[in-house]
Swiss-Prot record:
Catalyzes the CoA transfer from succinate to 3-oxoadipate (beta-ketoadipate). It catalyses: 3-oxoadipate + succinyl-CoA = 3-oxoadipyl-CoA + succinate. This is 3-oxoadipate CoA-transferase subunit A. It comes from Pseudomonas knackmussii (strain DSM 6978 / CCUG 54928 / LMG 23759 / B13). Its EC number is 2.8.3.6. SMART domains: CoA_trans. Pathway: Aromatic compound metabolism; beta-ketoadipate pathway; acetyl-CoA and succinyl-CoA from 3-oxoadipate: step 1/2.
Amino acid sequence: MAELLTLREAVERFVNDGDTVALEGFTHLIPTAASHEIIRQGKKDLHLVRMTPDLVYDLLIGAGCARKLTFSWGGNPGVGSLHRLRDAVEKGWPNALEIDEHSHADLANSYVAGASGLPFAVLRAYAGSDLPKVNPNIKFINCPFTGEQLAAVPSVRPDVTVIHAQKADRKGNVLLWGILGVQKEAALAAKRCIVTVEEIVDDLNAPMNSCVLPTWALSAVCHVPGGSHPSYAHGYYERDNRFYQAWDPIARDRETFTAWIDEYIRGTKDFSEFQAKIAEGK
């Protein structure tokens, strides 16, 4: 059953050094505030999983929190590369980073398999692809019924999944709407799940066929308004395109990046204080 906690309390209790951690959210509802809190608390040796690593994982990798990344695409959307990710892979700064690259369909199916309690996922994929040549976790099996060759990949079972959502009720049930990626599957695949939300209400008034994550599947719900900035939260605020553009020169240089996180993340007590500090600089 989900507890209503501060984000600081949730990260302290449920994210441990060495954990496999998935921060999911596609296009919007990206759990930025949670990534900041993981950095503030100095979590390390993490195996990060995310279908589309963007700024949140550039931050975590550059801050020295990660030892491995499982992913299916990485970049600063609409801008360019993730320079802290590249620096870690190419030059081992601040830590050497092991990478485990998959296709989108592969990783989505891996989450589904994890949520289903299965050891691996099976899919039609990788015909003509070079990924199986460089990723030993992509294997091939023959269907026992038709003989067809299929790809097989390990399921993803995070120690903890973190997502951002629009609403939760006071019992800890969570409502998401708009574009959904694999938040539901990642939450159900995990041993523990933290959800940050824009607001906590008495009644979700959930529309038919909406995505509701029940309290029994979650560990903690944290009230963090604006917690997915600079991504958008459908129905609450728009994407901050200027922030994504401004991130590129910050992340390109090690000293500039380190000074930025020291001032804006390690130098603030929580995401609310971070937001106020960012607003001052605009």
